[in-house]
């Protein structure tokens, strides 16, 4: 998970805690630039990435595919994601960096407004199709954590405050 797990998005939550939810404001790249890293979780993911080279750190986000560049830029200080090994500050793909470990990155399809539990279940199933076998999941939302816990053999780490949004 990205929002609330790797990045502190609390300053943007006010836009979706009201009725009607203002998803456009919540997803505004100008606001996302102020998302703060949650370094303890980032450090755990980086430790796995660098100390267990046979294993992959796989990223799955409920963010829409159209937010890929913003998301990759937000995480680029700590991670390189498959297909986006090097990105310029303008958000354009640069030359690939072959020596740096990269990570698969799954995102919600564009215009998919289903619940995160449904989307992340499908992302998990796609990971299996792609040959990955996730063993450990970090997430922050109670409903999504419940969904992850229902998958046999998967260890789940709750990094949230028990808050839905």
Task: Label every model-predicted segment.
Residues 1-111:
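Alpha-helical substrate-recognition element adjacent to the catalytic core
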Residues 13-15, 66, 114, 144, ...:
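Flexible, glycine-rich phosphate/dinucleotide-binding loops
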Residues 37-41, 117-120, 141:
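Amphipathic coiled-coil/heptad-repeat helices and related helical stalk/stem segments
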Residues 52-53, 127-133:
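Glycine-rich phosphate-binding loop signature in dinucleotide/nucleotide-binding domains
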Residues 69, 113-119, 145-147:
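Short, solvent-exposed polar/charged micro-motifs at secondary-structure junctions
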Residues 91, 115-127:
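Short loop-to-alpha-helix "cap/lid" segments that border enzyme active sites
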Residues 124, 132-165:
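Acidic, Mg2+-coordinating phosphoryl-transfer loop and its flanking beta/alpha structural elements
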């Amino acid at each position: 998970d990205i929002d609330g797990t790797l990045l502190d998005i609390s300053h943007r939550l006010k836009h979706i805690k009201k009725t009607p939810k203002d998803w456009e404001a919540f997803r505004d790249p100008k606001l996302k630039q102020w998302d703060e890293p949650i370094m303890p979780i980032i450090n755990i993911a980086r430790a796995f990435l660098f100390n267990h080279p046979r294993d992959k750190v796989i990223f799955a986000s409920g963010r829409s595919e159209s937010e890929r560049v913003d998301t990759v830029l937000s995480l680029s200080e700590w991670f390189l994601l498959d297909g986006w090994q090097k990105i310029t500050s303008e958000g354009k793909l640069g030359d690939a960096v072959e020596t740096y470990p990269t990570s698969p990155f799954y995102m919600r399809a564009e215009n998919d407004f289903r619940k995160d539990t449904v989307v992340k279940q499908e992302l998990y199933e796609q990971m299996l199709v792609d040959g990955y076998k996730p063993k450990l999941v970090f997430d922050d939302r109670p409903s999504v954590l419940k969904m992850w816990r229902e998958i046999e053999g998967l260890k789940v780490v709750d990094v949230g405050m028990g808050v839905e949004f």
